[in-house]
């Protein structure tokens, strides 16, 4: 055994062993319990960043732990390979997007392998390959046959910079999610999938996802935006037209002072034909229709249509306003506005000086002159004619009956969720397998002609879509001897990442989209890992696509994933200087050093120009802030295992991780300490005698009990709590105690050996190369990859006792022995039931109990 720990010698050797022996290749095995652990599909951008490393390390730790529990563990990996960056790189570098993508995949695959992740590489998928996306095209045709997809002229979110359509989920604060440029709204022919048909189940089934973060589920509930209410028909004054408007508070209808309609509403288009100022307003605001996120920040702009509707109960006329705070295509695009009791309506009314009528008594100011102040709470009606003094429920029922008699109301459930626009005006994506005849009829490409391949690129320009232009040779084809024009749009790349988890179960299945036997065995995914930024995009599409696959009998169960972890961001220090144009110039942390100025003050300066830098704090690692840390640099300096262990130790997984190289160095020292410990005790490998707890002395029992307590703690932290940082901390404590444990006899050697072997096993999911080699040294070249998780004995812990000092108001009363494995509540219960204690605290009022673990219990009376 080498005296010094040298990761550069160990890690390539171990990785080659895994590759040669196909250690992590798995197959369906009905005799073993399966476990499917999946990190989110990476985009092959060129290089891994620390966010990738954190995501994939979490997944690998869980996978290796579950494998040690004896489960058949599937952990696959692949590439989300279509997308705009490849297209832009192709234009810039005059190369094919496929070549750029494959080059990146090759490099990133090497990086992943250098980190020692236990992937089944035989299942690797690449979404830009025809053998993958041909099934996506096939499935789209099946959806078309079932009328679950359609094409229509629609107002869509248009990114003028990327020159493509964005789904609602891809618009963040009015900007493109990718390039951050302001989006516009335009009307063009687009393909949609009817996700709204599944809105109810997407909403309700969130309740079944018990092991998903509540924050993610709430974000999805808000995005789906289920709202139960009523649709009421209003007659337009002096017209035969009608407007259907929605409300989820029918009890407030007597407080309605205007109707709000969106710029997209057909009535808006109607009145704009005669009034140029309205047309101008619509042209301006249709590009800024409110998204869900924008409502709170919107400026509440609008224009009076100069038209009125008749209130269905009072028969009074109320104005119709075209406003910008109604979400595009929400419900009927028209709402009943009650500014006295709705915040958005109030804001709009105040700005435009509209009438406000209060109809709910404000509970805060009951029986005062202030009872008519604004409130959104449910309450008792007043100022509502025949409905005065009714509560919410009774008022709703009575108003509903009144309007039912007039046949102008129906109950309605509305969703903010819109059908999924999957058309993209880009080259590098999956071609949509549809075509249009000369008479305008849309037909599917015959299944025998799938996959529809992308045309070859011959000339590079600012757009690669020209080979797919409707006038191109590629687009103009014959189907059944009829001239047709292919669809020239490609799929939104979220399509590829919506079903890859199922294809991983059968990547080489060539007679169908999904092998029913394999999917039945492996699905659902037991653990999914990815960032919370995907909550309202990928994770909604992911769940929706699974329900589609289920309804086509391709998978079983209602949901694709049992457990979800959303890891936090990786932060790093950020520094900048102002340049001559007063713009921030971001300085990489490695280029910053500490010096003293002429006054003797400690300052941080740029190594290159020796000028003082400004500290911007801990910020998410990014190219724009020039504060990313290259994983390769850390691997070369400290080894992959050090990086992995630091990533898992530095913070709880759901929290942001602050990158500090001093912490990495500390982890490196810890691993060297363990290596030295094994080296110093390498002779214990000859010991075959098992520890006999009954003959141990006090010192030995203390060490052996600590070992078993650590196994319990680490097992619970990794398996149930997913608290990896505390698991590592417990192992560190055990290592520290073992380091000072003196060997005096054969029993001591047995304890040392069992402790070292258990430590290596517990560290294995975190530092697999390191543990692989140490295990070989202690076990005559045996392979740790097939070892089981260390076990503990309850009888050992039950015999482990500690003496607690019992105090009353700080004065010692007695000492009592308690078992160490008991928690605080169990210890207090045991102590309070002892007769000696009961006598001492009888007739005393206990104010509080102070408990110092394994030392003191103080009753403050």
UniProtKB/Swiss-Prot annotation:
Q: Which Pfam families match?
A: Anticodon_1 (PF08264), tRNA-synt_1 (PF00133), tRNA-synt_1_2 (PF13603), tRNA-synt_1g (PF09334)
Motif annotated as 'KMSKS' region, chain positions:
620-624
User: Which compartment or compartments is the protein found in?
Assistant: Cytoplasm
Picking any one GO molecular function of the record gives:
leucine-tRNA ligase activity
What InterPro entries does this protein map onto?
aa-tRNA-synth_I_CS (IPR001412), aa-tRNA-synth_Ia (IPR002300), Leu-tRNA-ligase (IPR002302), Leu_tRNA-synth_edit (IPR025709), M/V/L/I-tRNA-synth_anticd-bd (IPR013155), Methionyl/Leucyl_tRNA_Synth (IPR015413), Rossmann-like_a/b/a_fold (IPR014729), tRNAsynth_Ia_anticodon-bd (IPR009080)
Return the motif ranges for 'HIGH' region.
42-52
| One biological process term in Gene Ontology | leucyl-tRNA aminoacylation
Keyword match rRNA-binding? no
Into which family does the record put it? Belongs to the class-I aminoacyl-tRNA synthetase family.
What protein name applies here? Answer: Leucine--tRNA ligase
């Amino acid at each position: 055994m080498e005296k010094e720990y040298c990761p550069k010698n160990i890690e390539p050797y171990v990785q080659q062993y895994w590759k040669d022996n196909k250690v992590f290749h798995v197959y369906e095995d009905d005799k073993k319990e399966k476990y499917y652990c999946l990190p989110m599909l990476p985009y092959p951008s060129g290089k891994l960043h620390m966010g990738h490393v954190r995501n994939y390390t979490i997944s690998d730790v869980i996978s290796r732990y579950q494998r040690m529990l004896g489960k058949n563990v599937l952990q696959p990996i692949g590439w989300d390979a279509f997308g705009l960056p490849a297209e832009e790189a192709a234009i810039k570098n005059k190369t094919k997007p496929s070549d750029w993508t494959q080059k990146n995949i090759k490099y990133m695959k090497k990086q992943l392998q250098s980190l020692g992740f236990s992937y089944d590489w035989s299942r690797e998928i690449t979404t830009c390959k025809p053998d993958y996306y041909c099934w996506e095209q096939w499935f789209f045709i099946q959806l078309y046959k079932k009328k679950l997809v359609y094409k229509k002229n629609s107002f869509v979110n248009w990114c003028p910079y990327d020159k493509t359509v964005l789904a609602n989920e891809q618009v963040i604060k009015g900007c493109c999610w990718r390039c951050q440029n302001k989006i516009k709204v335009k009307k063009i022919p687009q393909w949609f999938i009817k996700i709204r048909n599944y809105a109810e189940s997407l909403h309700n089934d969130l309740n079944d996802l018990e092991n998903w973060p509540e924050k993610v589920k709430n974000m999805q509930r808000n995005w789906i935006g289920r709202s139960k209410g009523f649709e009421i028909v209003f007659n337009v004054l002096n017209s035969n037209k009608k407007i259907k408007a929605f409300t989820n508070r029918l009890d407030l209808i007597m407080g309605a002072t205007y109707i709000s309609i969106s710029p997209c509403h057909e009535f808006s288009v109607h009145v704009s034909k005669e009034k140029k100022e309205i047309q101008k307003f619509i042209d301006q605001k249709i590009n800024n229709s409110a998204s869900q996120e924008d409502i709170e920040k919107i400026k509440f702009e609008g224009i009076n249509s100069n038209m009125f509707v008749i209130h269905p109960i009072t028969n009074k006329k109320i104005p119709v306003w075209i406003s910008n705070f109604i979400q595009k295509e929400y419900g009927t695009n028209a709402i009943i506005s009650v500014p006295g009791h709705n915040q958005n309506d109030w804001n709009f009314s105040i700005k435009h000086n509209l009438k406000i009528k209060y109809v709910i008594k404000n509970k805060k100011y009951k029986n005062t002159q202030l009872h008519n102040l604004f409130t959104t709470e449910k309450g008792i009606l007043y100022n509502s004619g025949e409905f005065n003094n009714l509560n919410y429920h009774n008022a709703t029922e009575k108003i509903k009956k009144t309007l039912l008699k007039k046949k102008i109301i129906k109950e309605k459930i509305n969703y903010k969720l819109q059908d999924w626009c999957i058309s993209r005006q880009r080259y590098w994506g999956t071609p949509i397998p549809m075509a249009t005849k000369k008479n305008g009829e849309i037909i599917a490409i015959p299944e025998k002609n799938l996959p529809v391949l992308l045309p070859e690129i011959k000339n590079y320009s600012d757009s690669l879509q020209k080979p797919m232009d409707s006038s191109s040779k590629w687009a103009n084809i014959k189907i059944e001897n009829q001239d047709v024009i292919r669809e020239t749009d490609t799929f939104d790349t979220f399509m590829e990442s919506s079903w890859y988890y199922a294809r991983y179960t059968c990547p080489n299945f060539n007679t169908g989209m999904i092998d029913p036997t394999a999917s039945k065995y492996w699905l659902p995914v037991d653990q999914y890992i990815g960032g919370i930024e995907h909550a309202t995009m990928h994770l909604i599409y992911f769940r929706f696509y699974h329900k589609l696959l289920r309804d086509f009998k391709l998978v079983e169960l209602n949901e694709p994933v049992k457990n979800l972890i959303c890891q936090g961001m990786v932060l790093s220090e950020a520094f900048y200087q102002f340049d001559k144009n007063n713009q921030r110039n971001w300085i990489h942390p490695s280029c910053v050093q500490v010096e003293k100025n002429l006054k003797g003050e400690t300052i941080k300066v740029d190594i290159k120009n020796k000028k003082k830098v400004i500290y911007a704090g801990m910020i998410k690692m990014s190219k724009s802030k020039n504060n990313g840390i290259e994983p390769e640099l850390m691997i070369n300096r400290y080894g992959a295992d050090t990086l992995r262990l630091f990533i898992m130790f530095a913070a709880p997984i759901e929290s942001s991780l602050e990158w500090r190289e001093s912490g990495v160095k500390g982890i490196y020292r810890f691993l060297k300490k363990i290596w030295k410990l094994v080296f110093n005790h390498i002779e214990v490998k000859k010991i075959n005698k098992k520890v006999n707890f009954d003959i141990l002395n006090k010192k030995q029992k203390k060490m052996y009990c600590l070992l078993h307590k650590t196994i319990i703690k680490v097992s619970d932290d990794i398996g149930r709590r997913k608290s990896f940082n505390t698991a590592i901390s417990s192992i560190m404590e055990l290592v520290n105690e073992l380091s000072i444990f003196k060997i005096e006899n054969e029993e001591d050697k047995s304890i040392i050996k069992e402790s070292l072997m258990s430590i290596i096993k517990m560290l294995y999911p975190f530092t697999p190369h390191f543990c692989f080699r140490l295990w070989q040294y202690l076990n005559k070249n045996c392979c740790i990859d097939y070892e089981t998780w260390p076990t503990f004995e309850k009888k050992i812990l039950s015999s482990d006792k500690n003496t607690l000092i019992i105090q009353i108001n700080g004065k010692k009363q007695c000492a009592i022995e308690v078992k160490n494995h008991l928690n605080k509540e169990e210890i207090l219960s045991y102590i309070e039931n002892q007769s000696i204690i009961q006598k001492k605290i009888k007739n005393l009022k206990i104010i509080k109990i102070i408990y110092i673990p394994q030392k003191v219990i103080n009753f403050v009376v």
